[in-house]
Design a protein with these regions (language model features):
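Canonical Rossmann dinucleotide-binding motif of NAD(H)/NADP(H)-dependent dehydrogenases/reductases
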Residues: 2-32
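The beta1-alpha1 cofactor-binding region of Rossmann-like NAD(H)/NADP(H)-dependent oxidoreductases
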Residues: 38-39, 59-71, 105, 216-217
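Active-site helix of classical SDR
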Residues: 123, 156-159, 164
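A conserved structural motif in NAD(P)-dependent oxidoreductases
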Residues: 207-218, 229
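Alpha-helical segment proximal to the catalytic Tyr-Lys
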Residues: 128, 169-173, 231
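Short C-terminal tail/terminal secondary-structure segment
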Residues: 92, 97, 148, 205, ...
Length: 248
């Protein structure tokens, strides 16, 4: 599906990002496994290569413009260009449900700089390279938290949805499409680390399909949105949530 294509996946050292990176490689893409966790990214890239795919790893802080530019320069230097970007990097400390009125501002700013601003920083770093190749596609990671509650994790994802729609307007003339996936609760190590068991149980009760999702449940939507099959789709947010939104 993606032979001769080049994809950057941020936050790809584990969980959902790892699943995206591995799936893209299986479909023939050359993958840049990018993460602030350099050792984790290296391990994922090594596994992709061992499985017969093509990948490199690049350390990146998505909130830092110089770091994002270095990531993109490395990708272009090795593979010659960029076709796809998956803005998946995130930090999850906000799942402790602090109120906006009480969360420490320094933590709030750091949280938003990664979960919201990082989408814009990485998109700005990559779009000119996509335009040089005649277009491209971007997938942002949102969340059903944008619709369901208003702590600052959800607020960051509301912002991601807004960025997705505004950037679709700005990038369309360059034949660059940008969409977002809004997962419901996904069973990953990060989720298990920050989410109390009782809260997980309560979340599952809001899902008509009666289970948490897995990273693999999201892969098909990501591949579709990057592919030519989605060539007339941009600026959209797709809930992949086991029906959580319709019950909540």
């Amino acid at each position: 599906m993606f032979d001769s294509k080049v994809a950057i996946v941020t936050g790809a050292a584990q969980g959902i990002g790892q699943a995206y990176a591995q799936a893209l490689a299986r479909e023939g893409a050359s993958v840049v496994v990018a993460d602030i966790n350099a050792d984790g990214a290296a391990a994922v890239a090594k596994q992709i290569v061992a499985d017969g795919g093509t990948a490199i790893h690049v350390p990146v802080d998505v909130s830092d413009e110089d770091s994002a530019k270095a990531m993109v320069d490395r990708a272009v230097g090795v593979f010659g260009g960029i076709d796809y970007l998956v803005n998946n990097a995130a930090i999850y400390g906000g799942m402790k449900l602090d109120l906006l009125l009480t969360v420490p501002l320094d933590y709030y700013k750091k949280f938003m700089s990664v979960n919201h601003d990082g989408v814009l920083v990485c998109t700005r770093a990559v779009y000119k390279h996509m335009a040089k190749r005649g277009g491209g596609a971007i997938v942002n990671q949102s969340s059903t938290a944008a619709w369901l509650y208003s702590n600052f994790y959800g607020l960051a994802k509301v912002g991601v949805n807004g960025l997705t729609q505004q950037l679709a307007r700005e990038l369309g003339g360059m034949k660059i499409r940008i969409n977002a996936i809004a997962p419901g609760p996904i069973d990953t190590e990060a989720t298990r680390t920050v989410t109390p068991a009782e809260l997980v149980k309560n979340m599952v009760q809001t899902i008509p399909l009666s289970r948490m999702g897995t990273p693999e449940d999201l892969v098909g939507m990501c591949l579709f949105l990057l592919s030519d099959s989605a060539s007339w789709i941009t600026g959209q947010i797709f809930n992949v949530d086991g029906g959580q939104i319709i019950r909540s």
